[in-house]
């Protein structure tokens, strides 16, 4: 499951990315996480969790205490779809 994955960012996540640009520490954390999951999807640490309920196909990693990076993995296409980069599962 390792190898380079292509990142796809949803419109909602793109809006989140614009908000994050205002906060250098958040921006740096997001960039680091995006590079990490692109190169080594299930590297731990930093910890990730598989979500449940209507988000059961998604994974989450902590950006900071308040914000989470939420994404879906399409293994066959080697693609990661970024769903959210802001708040804590509010989408």
Residues covered by each model-derived region:
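Enriched for short, Lys/Arg-rich terminal
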Residues: 1-6, 12-20, 24-31, 45, ...
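Blade/loop signatures of beta-propeller domains
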Residues: 39-41
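Acidic, metal-coordinating catalytic cores used for nucleic-acid/nucleotide bond scission
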Residues: 55
